């Protein structure tokens, strides 16, 4: 079958032929319809330090997808041939304390699809049936293909009660923009997103965010005054991994504020811890999605009117995958969809 693989320990991703994966007793075989390029895939393409330490070569990459069930393992219940599915990209062990306690998103033995085992940038994918999620009929293939990153956004945004709250989102990448849109959709008062990438800030404006702020040109305190905010942000969603952005968030949080962190800062990032302590801030780390509570919330948010369509900016045939990666690497894109049909 046709697949996109990391074939060499250098920059790039290559089209290749690989065997169709074998179906296990507890697995589904999925014929891929559409995939989306994740920032993780760009890291793998660039062959950065993280990728060099993490990705075995060769490896079929990709973990954002929608497809159709074409094979069912003999022990699988609850699925039928033709079901349209996406899937949780974190394969968990099932036997650690967190898995047995129902906190599977915190499994210490997690394996990543397209990272530690063959991924979805291929004509066919095999995953455990436990990881598959049926897509409702009224959700498009394009939106289903981005459920994985949308899940990161939903998990982060819904970590805290947002109704009537003032929310700061630092980092206007696709996940940050979707998190901001979720916050607005569920009843936050003011949702402010910050970045220095004007293209992506404009995408955020199309999603109905209260204010998209280019911090290279505007002062966040001035924006807060303009919005009538006198006490700081109640909730912070840190999506950038940029130390200056996180420090600004700490400066502008209200006392007792709550912060969810999805962005990955450098290991040597320094902050003024007195602001965390004396403001009584709560900081929560976010990894992946809650299985599968986040997935049900994702579907319900879209079905209740949340419009994510502006975040998808580019669509290509899989044969033009290089154009898709070029768009993602340029920083002048939202989500990029690759069609396998």
Swiss-Prot record:
<feature type="binding site">
    <location>
        <position position="195"/>
    </location>
    <ligand>
        <name>NAD(+)</name>
    </ligand>
</feature>
<comment type="subunit">
    <text>Homotetramer.</text>
</comment>
<comment type="pathway">
    <text>Amino-acid degradation; L-threonine degradation via oxydo-reductase pathway; glycine from L-threonine: step 1/2.</text>
</comment>
<feature type="binding site">
    <location>
        <position position="64"/>
    </location>
    <ligand>
        <name>Zn(2+) 1</name>
    </ligand>
</feature>
<feature type="active site" description="Charge relay system">
    <location>
        <position position="40"/>
    </location>
</feature>
<comment type="similarity">
    <text>Belongs to the zinc-containing alcohol dehydrogenase family.</text>
</comment>
<feature type="binding site">
    <location>
        <position position="93"/>
    </location>
    <ligand>
        <name>Zn(2+) 2</name>
    </ligand>
</feature>
<dbReference type="GO" id="GO:0046870">
    <property type="term" value="F:cadmium ion binding"/>
</dbReference>
<protein>
    <recommendedName>
        <fullName>L-threonine 3-dehydrogenase</fullName>
        <ecNumber>1.1.1.103</ecNumber>
    </recommendedName>
</protein>
<dbReference type="InterPro" id="IPR013154">
    <property type="entry name" value="ADH-like_N"/>
</dbReference>
<dbReference type="InterPro" id="IPR050129">
    <property type="entry name" value="Zn_alcohol_dh"/>
</dbReference>
<dbReference type="GO" id="GO:0006564">
    <property type="term" value="P:L-serine biosynthetic process"/>
</dbReference>
<feature type="binding site">
    <location>
        <position position="107"/>
    </location>
    <ligand>
        <name>Zn(2+) 2</name>
    </ligand>
</feature>
<feature type="binding site">
    <location>
        <begin position="286"/>
        <end position="287"/>
    </location>
    <ligand>
        <name>NAD(+)</name>
    </ligand>
</feature>
<dbReference type="GO" id="GO:0008743">
    <property type="term" value="F:L-threonine 3-dehydrogenase activity"/>
</dbReference>
<dbReference type="GO" id="GO:0008270">
    <property type="term" value="F:zinc ion binding"/>
</dbReference>
<feature type="binding site">
    <location>
        <position position="200"/>
    </location>
    <ligand>
        <name>NAD(+)</name>
    </ligand>
</feature>
<keyword id="KW-0560">Oxidoreductase</keyword>
<feature type="binding site">
    <location>
        <position position="96"/>
    </location>
    <ligand>
        <name>Zn(2+) 2</name>
    </ligand>
</feature>
<dbReference type="InterPro" id="IPR011032">
    <property type="entry name" value="GroES-like_sf"/>
</dbReference>
<dbReference type="GO" id="GO:0016491">
    <property type="term" value="F:oxidoreductase activity"/>
</dbReference>
<dbReference type="Pfam" id="PF08240">
    <property type="entry name" value="ADH_N"/>
</dbReference>
<dbReference type="InterPro" id="IPR020843">
    <property type="entry name" value="PKS_ER"/>
</dbReference>
<comment type="function">
    <text>Catalyzes the NAD(+)-dependent oxidation of L-threonine to 2-amino-3-ketobutyrate. To a lesser extent, also catalyzes the oxidation of D-allo-threonine and L-threonine amide, but not that of D-threonine and L-allothreonine. Cannot utilize NADP(+) instead of NAD(+).</text>
</comment>
<dbReference type="GO" id="GO:0005829">
    <property type="term" value="C:cytosol"/>
</dbReference>
<dbReference type="GO" id="GO:0030145">
    <property type="term" value="F:manganese ion binding"/>
</dbReference>
<feature type="binding site">
    <location>
        <position position="175"/>
    </location>
    <ligand>
        <name>NAD(+)</name>
    </ligand>
</feature>
<dbReference type="GO" id="GO:0019518">
    <property type="term" value="P:L-threonine catabolic process to glycine"/>
</dbReference>
<keyword id="KW-0963">Cytoplasm</keyword>
<keyword id="KW-0170">Cobalt</keyword>
<feature type="active site" description="Charge relay system">
    <location>
        <position position="43"/>
    </location>
</feature>
<keyword id="KW-0479">Metal-binding</keyword>
<feature type="binding site">
    <location>
        <position position="99"/>
    </location>
    <ligand>
        <name>Zn(2+) 2</name>
    </ligand>
</feature>
<dbReference type="GO" id="GO:0006567">
    <property type="term" value="P:threonine catabolic process"/>
</dbReference>
<feature type="binding site">
    <location>
        <position position="63"/>
    </location>
    <ligand>
        <name>Zn(2+) 1</name>
    </ligand>
</feature>
<feature type="binding site">
    <location>
        <begin position="262"/>
        <end position="264"/>
    </location>
    <ligand>
        <name>NAD(+)</name>
    </ligand>
</feature>
<feature type="binding site">
    <location>
        <position position="38"/>
    </location>
    <ligand>
        <name>Zn(2+) 1</name>
    </ligand>
</feature>
<dbReference type="InterPro" id="IPR013149">
    <property type="entry name" value="ADH-like_C"/>
</dbReference>
<keyword id="KW-0520">NAD</keyword>
<dbReference type="InterPro" id="IPR036291">
    <property type="entry name" value="NAD(P)-bd_dom_sf"/>
</dbReference>
<dbReference type="InterPro" id="IPR002328">
    <property type="entry name" value="ADH_Zn_CS"/>
</dbReference>
<dbReference type="Pfam" id="PF00107">
    <property type="entry name" value="ADH_zinc_N"/>
</dbReference>
